[in-house]
Amino acid sequence: MKVELVASTENAEIIIERAMRICHGGDVDPEKGANKTFIQNIIKLGHESPLEHGVMTFKIMDVSRSLTHQLVRHRIASYTQKSQRYCKEDQFGYVIPPEIEKNETFKTEFINMCKKINDLYTYLTLSGVKREDARYILPNACFTDIWVTMNFRELRSFFKLRCDKHAQWEIRNLAKEMLRIAYSKYPIVFEDLYNVFLLNDFKVEV
């Protein structure tokens, strides 16, 4: 799994504070920077709509299609995914679940099955079967890449659900990596979630 921050809102925390203060007829001097206490108190009160003015775009690579099936359920976001209809999938990479990987017998069978699927996929496409039809035999473990754009409010909702210990392991790993990146970029907005889900995992330079 690889996660890359492609783009994000410049001066997002100042923009968010200004949006928060306009609700009360006020404004803020951008030269002074964002007021951490003010923003975090407003978030604690549940007034999160101003967070929608901040946006992050991530490039996510080498994850399973099982993961992306879960990811796209978070609907207040924009997604663009590698297409198995147009892209060749011969010699596809795949994710091996830890529960299978730790058992050598299961792991060997898993790898052999993926090789058989790859061989059949290659045979079908070389025999004239269209990729859009040959792809039906590909496993959920197959690597895929996806771009994701979420506003800060939706990101916070995503992190609360998917960083939780009850979330499925692969999307939990993704969510934690995205949170690490989000916190390093915007510590005021994401500090509370970092402290809950990542503080004991590793430290982030901010």
Predicted feature locations:
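Family-specific signature for flavin-dependent thymidylate synthase
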Residues: 1-206
